[in-house]
Amino acid sequence: MAMKAVCVLKGDGPVQGTINFEQKESNGPVKVWGSITGLAEGLHGFHVHQFGDNTQGCTSAGPHFNPLSRKHGGPEDEERHVGDLGNVTAGKDGVAKVSIEDSVISLSGDHSIIGRTLVVHEKADDLGKGGNEESTKTGNAGSRLACGVIGIAQ
């Protein structure tokens, strides 16, 4: 049975958006789509973080969701956090149209992202290839512009 989820992204500044998730079968890939507005033109890191806690803004969401204790990487890499979804690209109009299919995240089971926080970052994610320690943790993606808790949808 298909599962669906949704996340409304908000931050302290102009960045906001709505991201949808759908998984047709429990061990199948998750489709991720939607749009984010108010971004600077270019690439922005896009990750699922550990906690669904936004009590202190996006900071209380903790680190990237990483139940397998791996190093940070890109969405196509074998060595990656479960929450590593790479980058979204904003055009000159500040809008990023998101369309991703990922086989590591899930809407159920051990890798479920339900109840966790989705974050869009200030800078591009270097996908763990930045050559320093921070790269292997965060991809040097910078501050958290907007976030929201991923919830079950109809």
UniProtKB/Swiss-Prot annotation:
The molecular function GO annotations come to:
copper ion binding; protein phosphatase 2B binding; protein-folding chaperone binding; superoxide dismutase activity; zinc ion binding
InterPro entries the UniProt entry points to = SOD-like_Cu/Zn_dom_sf (IPR036423), SOD_Cu/Zn_/chaperone (IPR024134), SOD_Cu/Zn_BS (IPR018152), SOD_Cu_Zn_dom (IPR001424)
Query: What is the UniProt remark on how the cofactor binds and its stoichiometry?
Result: Binds 1 copper ion per subunit. Binds 1 zinc ion per subunit.
| Chief localization | cytoplasm
Lipidation, kind S-palmitoyl cysteine: residue numbers? Answer: C7
Keywords, comma-separated and alphabetical: Acetylation, Antioxidant, Copper, Cytoplasm, Disulfide bond, Lipoprotein, Metal-binding, Nucleus, Oxidoreductase, Palmitate, Phosphoprotein, Zinc
The catalysed reaction is: 2 superoxide + 2 H(+) = H2O2 + O2
Task: Provide the positions where the record notes the PTM N-acetylalanine.
Answer: A2
Q: Where is this region: Disordered?
A: 59-81
One protein family per Pfam:
Sod_Cu
Write down the top EC class of this protein.
Answer: oxidoreductase
Q: PTM details?
A: Palmitoylation helps nuclear targeting and decreases catalytic activity. Succinylation, adjacent to copper catalytic site, probably inhibits activity. Desuccinylation by SIRT5 enhances activity.
**Which residues bind Zn(2+) per the record?**
H64, H72, H81, D84
Its subcellular locations are: Cytoplasm; Nucleus
Q: What is its EC number?
A: 1.15.1.1
Keyword Transmembrane helix tagged: no
Q: What does this protein do?
A: Destroys radicals which are normally produced within the cells and which are toxic to biological systems.
Family the UniProt entry places it in: Belongs to the Cu-Zn superoxide dismutase family.
Q: How does it assemble?
A: Homodimer; non-disulfide-linked. Heterodimer with SOD1. The heterodimer CCS:SOD1 interacts with SLC31A1; this heterotrimer is Cu(1+)-mediated and its maintenance is regulated through SOD1 activation.
The protein here is known as Superoxide dismutase [Cu-Zn]
In which organism is this protein found? Sapajus apella (Brown-capped capuchin)
| Encoding gene per record | SOD1
